[in-house]
Amino acid sequence: MQHQSLSVRNSSGISGNRDENFPSVRSSKVTVKTASISAKMAPHTQGSNLTIKQQYQPHQWPWNTSNNTNATNSNNVQSNNNSSTATSNSSTNSNNSPAVNTPTTQNQSQPTTQQSNTALVAAAAAGTLSVTAVNKLKRLQPTTHSEASTNTRSNSTNTIASGAKRIRTTNVEKVNKSVGTNTTGLSGPPGLVAVGSSLTTSAANATTTKKLTQMAIVAASNTSHHHQQISTAGTTTTTITKNAKNFTASGNADLCNANKITAGRATTLKTTTASSTTTATAEAEAEITTTTELMTTTSTVLQQKSIIKTGPVKTSNAASLEKYLNLLQQQQATSITPATTLKKVERKTARIAPTVSLTRKVSHSPQGGLGVGQPKKPVTIAPRTSDPKLSINYNQQMVATTATSAISTGNQLIKQQDQQLVKSPQSTVLLTTIRIPQQQQQHQQSTQTQQQTSQNQSQPQQNQTQAQLQAQQQFKQVVQQQLQLSSPPRTPTKLGSAVFQFHPQTTTVMPNLVQIPNLVPTQPVSSAAAKLNAPVVASSTTSSPTTANLVMNNATHGLTATRLNNGTTQLYMNGAVIKLHQIQQQQQQAIGTAGQQAPTPQQSLPMDSATVSMGLNGLLTKSATLSTAASTISTNQPAHQAKAFTLHAQKPTQLYQQANTSTATAYTPQPFFMAPSGQILLNTAALPTMLTSASLQQALVQAAQANIPALHPLQPSQPQSTQLPNITAIIQQQQQQQQQQQMLPNFHQLLANIPQAVLQNLQSTTKLGQTPQFVPIPSNLFLNPQNPVYTSSPSSSSFTSPITISTSTLPSGSTTISQPLSPPPLVATVPTYTTTAKPIMNTLNNQKIIIASATSTTSSKPPPPIKPISSTEPPKLVPVQLNKPSISITPVISNPPKLVPPSAPVPKLVLSASVATKATSTTPIKDKPKPNLPMSEPPALAPASCTPPLLTAPAPLPVASVPSPVLSPRAIDNKSPPALNPLSLDCGSSNDSGIVANSSDTEDKSLTIDLCSPGSPDSTPQKKDEESRQESTPSPVPSPSPLSEPPVIPAESEPEPEPEPELEPEPEMEPEPETEPEPEVEPEPEDEPHLEEPKIDESSEAVELPELEDPQPSPPLPCELPPPPTIETDLLDTLSLPPSQKSPKSLLLEQIKLKLPDQPDDQPQESMSSDQDYSNQSPLDESSPTGSAEPSESQRSTTPVDMSPPSIETDFLNTPQMTESAKSPILSQPKTIRFPAQNGVHHNFGRKGFRRLSDGRLFGVCYWSNCDAQFDTSSKLLDHLQIQHVNTQTGPFACLWDGCKVHNKESCSRRWLERHVLSHGGSKPHKCIVAGCGMRFGSQLALEKHVNHHFNNTDNASAGKRSSDPPLPKVLRKTGKKLRYRRQPWSARRFDFFDIGVMEGLQHRLIMAGSVASARRGTVTFRGQAAGRRVTGFGAEVFVKWYPREIISDDWIPEAEVTSTREISIYELNPDQRFELEAQLKTNRKANAELLFCLHELNLKLQAEASSTSCSRSSFSSSSSSSSSSGCSSASSSLISTPIPFNSRTEPKKLRKPPKQSYQPSSSGTTSSLSSVLSSSASSLLSNENSSSSSSSSSSSSSSSSSTS
């Protein structure tokens, strides 16, 4: 549907162009300039006397606005071509709403591409409110769209523009742009929406002013239909339909999408103008609706008409401020939220001030023309402050969505929630102007006041919601949005600006905003769902003044769960869903601490992370189905908007009551899923799961209550007094809600969906006065659909799992929750964590969720640390994340893939975060608790049992505990748990806290991982390396051994001893914290393998067996400083730090290191073999050889120089020398110098070096007959030709140049010959006559000029410096530049990689090689063994087998010629034989030594028969040869036997084989006997230079070797 541009309504007149889709009222101020809105200026709502600055949301409006954002008087093509665009507009208005809006606007904008002339819009809006793109009244864009519809509409352009801007809106950028005004980073309009809602609800009077318009926009943004309205300004019905379709994303709502958008906006306006609803003024108010369209969704058309009727909205600018205040008051009365109204008024005032001072100074007076230009000034507008109140906007949007249609709410909830998560931190900034109270509620800072306000607001909102749900869900949305604007409590808004704030909250302001945004996603998906959701939202957000507190904790926990269960109010946050799950997990942990989260998990269990994401679609789908009903209801809803809003406010109480009364019913709603189309679908299969999850949560709650004390310390963070008022408000609201719910069956359904346990948890949380806003509700509600998925954390504790789920599902969701409560929970968490390792770990899991959601919640239910699935991790995570709630949680989400958490809770911090990050998609919560202390963790813990005390110490540190979830991805990899750091006690304490701290920095996942990494602050780099190696070769079996063997590992080569000692003190305790739920793990290292495996299983994404195993070995390594360097592979694997998991790269590096020579002098052969074994067995973690190899590897890294020094070649091959050689680049590259150093011929011939002529001849070479002279330069060649070949001729003159065309053709002209030879010798025959100048020129004239320059004073100095011969080729000279390309071969000579060091090394190696080849250039001595004898015609023959075997063939030798040894030059061996010889030298030396030694014994026996003279001679020759080649026989000696490891003959071969350890050559005297033994044995390289004595030496060597042996 294309929206025709809406004419600006004068305050007095109704006439004007209206959007085709809906007759939304538009005051002149309401008129939105598309161009100006497109501009990145905060939209302004200006009355004649009132200028309302809207939060600057350059990204939000873009959905509706065309790409042109720059000109006040510019034709902006606003096209809502795709539902995503429309949603973006809504998201701009509200953080949470965008998700829903995107579908709605998208539907509208696709059909409608509106170009709005900003100037025209401003002119039209002169009478009423005019919104300019500069002012950034993106919310008011509907008017712009209406006007734009007048102009050419281009769907493609609009879509692009919307998409581009929309992206901005989705981001947190907008929050940053407007300080005071932008409450939500992405939904600047949310603040305005709140105001707009009031105005809309009260009458069109306030709508007249820009502020009113902005308020309407804010409401619309909450509804996240603002852009949709812009798109649908022309056609009310169409817009409504599109909104429904967008939210629902179902074919059913295709017709209703535009109506839905309009209806949503109208609903908001209706709520505001419920009292002054008049059909007569519907047309005039269509434009106002454009301003406030964002607020209205399903019933936007009728409501907008009513708004248009409203005189105040239409009133001229002069009356805008007064009317705006009046409207606010009216809205307050309607919604029964006086405090909210006051806040709205304040926001208006704030907006007015910012409007003038902001980006562009546009006069506050509402002028049609100015409207275009004004949008710039409201970059930071008070209305944006509504954005900070994520919960309020969210609630409002929720209500509006419910009233308008479940479909609209579905998409809005999804996107708005994501945006809200993104923008939640910014909501804090926006709080400064108007939205501070709401934001505080969200943040629990102004929890009490906001709770009270929420109560006031929520009741009217719930009432309105009921009426709206009955009449029109759209109106309900409008009312909610308006109430949100006016009242801090975040009532069920449409997930508009509030929801968009989610992301900001996740970052910084997350604690409060995040909490509410979590609730925000719980928007009704269908009319019935909307009704149910609206009460739930109202109760969750509006029920308590501190909507963020109780709503987030209780309402969010319970209501959100019910929404998820119902599928109507499922908290489908676009990006917030995951965050909500994380928050839910945290909240669940907190509630588990309070003992209230059992019911919440029940709700959340039915919904998986997939269910949540799918549920969003399903919710949208349902919304589409319900959109028609919502539209039908929307007409009647105007009067009931206030009631619906009130119902929402009261809904928490009703929710609790109904949950208590009908837990099964609560589970039934959980089956509702969001279909990809956006509809809510009931999953019958989910019913059993819901029931099971409900029972599970109860059981978890009971189990977790034991750990509540640990969690309790975390909870005190929030003042109980603040929560208590919330509780009172909630109770009052509950009563109202019960009444209203009776009126509205949907509310009852929603309450029924909420489990009794959830309601009880909410109530108990409120009683505790811990402001469990986030923890109770969000964790379960958000996780409700996917508890099984998040089971890893829920299993530990029902409460925790929802939070964990939210964390994993929404990167910023958990952060959002943690913000408000983060500081206090840290302390509490730390104590709990410190108190008991396991309880602490459990607490960490629970607290993590609590902290992520809110620390106060944890305090509320302090008693037992929750052992629930994710409870283990929260304690650490909670403290860390509290510091940086938004960031820390988000990182956790990002990390989830790495996390092993589900099955490896051992790294509690990491695990909790990772589990949350995982979004609990891998395993149900139940499963996680067991693996919670990752089975692999316990061994690590045992080695690092010192860690538990450290954990206790870090527990206080856990201020960064919250970030611990962030750590999860890396923490699991590098360091299993922050607190239960397998690394070492240091890891446990400082590392734990450090990990927590890093975790708190959500952005710094890597930091978190590093802290947790095996080389934590305590562990040294080597330690990390070892851990990485161990990880590379994890061995599940060794896990039990690590505890027993930890001492051995550290000694091997880890500078980690320092951290290790810490771990040693309490090896058992460490496991406990890690496996908080499972005490068994801590004491028993044996469990480690089992835990390890489960851990791996649970962390399907990030966790790998090596990673799990690594954490286990890690802790032992730290504790094992004492053990000797030699450690078996099993021990090493076991000792490998669990936290430091090796990536494929690290594994490869480890293997490479293993292959590198790293053998101590004491046992070179063994080390070599062990290295080989390790490299071979490294994949097998359990193999003991690997263990030994690992120590050697660590030694290698520690003391790689420990190679036998005597052999240069070996040293050179050793790692250190290799490093040196690596230093000279040429060693690894071709080592040929490109240009000869002596001559610069190449230089003369340009870049190509020696160039060739066309005939292929080289330059510089004289091809004259009988002349082979060569010259470096062409100049020299020309001189040679002139002097030797031309001047010598007396005539006739002939050219004797080979190949010359005129070869030997006589000429009578010497001058001709002189010119001719220039073609052969060069093109520049004329040489400068000045001494020292070798310049040549092609012409005499050029030479003359040059020579004259020599005598010019100016050129004298420089002329002499020039090179004698310019080597420039023609190609270079063609450029006209005097190129001196390579006068000197600088590139080759300057960068010669054969530097002095390299040459010395080569020389040394040559010397060593010479010693090896001193005999006959190197020979191999084979030992022969007589295997048989035969008699032939020629005589007796003996069959001799030569050892080593299979290198040379065995043969029959005449008996008289049989010798025990045989020397063969290595150069005489064929390639196959040489290959076999190399293979022999590389084989296990021990085995070869034994075999060779046995053969040697046989040879000795044979040699005994030899003559004594030959024996003595061989001894002498062998000694001399061995002395000459002391380093050459080490390889053969190693092959022969271990007893001969020092044989020098082996050295050269070893040098050639880097992997083989080099052995120190023995003294020459000793070497002689050893070398003889080696030569007799077989694989030594003989260095004897005398070939004549080689035969005798072979026999004598065997005899001498026998004597030696």
From Swiss-Prot:
Residues 1053-1090, 1099-1110 have a biased composition (Acidic residues). Gene3D superfamilies: Classic Zinc Finger (3.30.160.60). One of its GO terms (molecular function) is zinc ion binding. A zinc finger (C2H2-type) spans 1260-1285, 1293-1320, 1326-1350. Keywords: Chromatin regulator, Metal-binding, Nucleus, Repeat, Repressor, Transcription, Transcription regulation, Zinc, Zinc-finger. Residues 1021-1030 have a biased composition (Basic and acidic residues). Disulfide bonds: none annotated. One of its GO terms (biological process) is chromatin organization. It comes from the Eukaryota. Residues 1-15, 991-1000, 1165-1201 have a biased composition (Polar residues). It is found in: Nucleus. One of its GO terms (cellular component) is ESC/E(Z) complex. Residues 1035-1049, 1112-1126 have a biased composition (Pro residues). Residues 64-117, 1135-1149, 1511-1537, 1556-1605 have a biased composition (Low complexity). May functionally interact with Polycomb group (PcG) and trithorax group (trxG) proteins to repress transcription. Belongs to the AEBP2/jing C2H2-type zinc-finger family. PANTHER family: ZINC FINGER PROTEIN AEBP2 (PTHR46541:SF1). This is Zinc finger protein jing homolog. It comes from Aedes aegypti.
